[in-house]
From Swiss-Prot:
It comes from Listeria welshimeri serovar 6b (strain ATCC 35897 / DSM 20650 / CCUG 15529 / CIP 8149 / NCTC 11857 / SLCC 5334 / V8). InterPro entries: Glc/Gal-6P_isomerase (IPR006148), Glucosamine6P_isomerase (IPR004547), Glucosamine6P_isomerase_CS (IPR018321), NagB/RpiA_transferase-like (IPR037171). The active site is at D63 (proton acceptor), N129 (for ring-opening step), H131 (proton acceptor), E136 (for ring-opening step). It catalyses: alpha-D-glucosamine 6-phosphate + H2O = beta-D-fructose 6-phosphate + NH4(+). It is an enzyme of class 3 (hydrolase). Pathway: Amino-sugar metabolism; N-acetylneuraminate degradation; D-fructose 6-phosphate from N-acetylneuraminate: step 5/5. This is Glucosamine-6-phosphate deaminase. Belongs to the glucosamine/galactosamine-6-phosphate isomerase family. NagB subfamily. Catalyzes the reversible isomerization-deamination of glucosamine 6-phosphate (GlcN6P) to form fructose 6-phosphate (Fru6P) and ammonium ion.
Length: 234
């Protein structure tokens, strides 16, 4: 596990972009795994400004809310289109279908996509409870793409994106921890003091399902990029 501490979110995002650009330029990155939320927003803004050619790059996404149409402004389809896909051309892009009526079939479909498009670099954020994707504490390290019941703390953290608290979905489709660990390389981004405890447990704590991100200690190629605040407890 390589640890990089930067001055702020912009510097950290630029460092992540350097790794991604190099992988695309050398042809090592054919599939790029993407995350959502506030953490990668600056990375995507920098990627849009970059001259790197992404027209031969396929993207996959970690998760999507259950019950939201792709056109819903709170969906991750909408988020990705708004921040990245409408501004930068990719070969093809895959996300779970939030409107799927058969959850089991949708999870199997998405896992098949991940098998057909092995992820070369997976970008991750981390929740204050150590979740990666929507894999909450207690999730099996052997999990594949699955339907998740969102915890109160995760819904609380995400309610700022919704007009009303009751509008925050209760379920999501998420790549499983095993699905994430199948990526050849992982870049974990964390910025801000509120992520410091989760980062401490991820890097220095035991590998335990109560901190899902701690499983990254077992991955052969992880780069953790932090700002000074997120690194403050290390």
């Amino acid at each position: 596990m390589q640890l990089i501490t930067t001055e702020n979110k912009l510097a950290g995002s630029k460092k992540a972009l350097e790794i991604i650009e190099k992988g695309i330029t050398t042809g090592e990155v054919n599939t790029l795994g993407l995350a959502t939320g506030s953490t990668p927003e600056t990375l995507y803004a920098e990627l849009v400004k970059s001259d790197v050619d992404t027209t031969n790059v396929t993207t996959t996404n970690l998760d999507e809310y259950v019950g939201l149409a792709a056109s819903d402004p709170n969906s991750y389809h909408y988020y990705m289109n708004n921040l990245l896909f409408s501004k930068k051309a990719f070969k093809e892009s895959f996300l779970p279908n939030g409107e799927a009526t058969d959850a089991e079939a949708e999870c199997a479909r998405y896992e098949e996509i991940l098998t057909e498009h092995p992820i070369d670099i997976q970008v991750l954020g981390i929740g204050t409870n150590g979740h990666i994707g929507f894999n909450e504490p207690g999730t099996s390290f052997d999990s594949l793409t699955h339907k998740v019941v969102l915890t109160d703390s995760t819904r609380e953290a995400n309610k700022r994106f919704f007009e009303r608290e009751e509008d925050v979905p209760t379920h999501a489709y998420s790549m499983g921890i095993k699905s994430i660990m199948n990526a050849k390389k992982i870049i974990l981004l964390a910025f801000g003091e509120n992520k410091a405890q989760a980062i401490k447990e991820t890097i220095k704590g035991p590998v335990d399902v109560n901190c899902p991100a701690s499983v990254l200690q077992n991955h052969p190629d992880v780069t953790v990029i932090l700002d000074n605040e997120a690194a403050s407890l290390l």
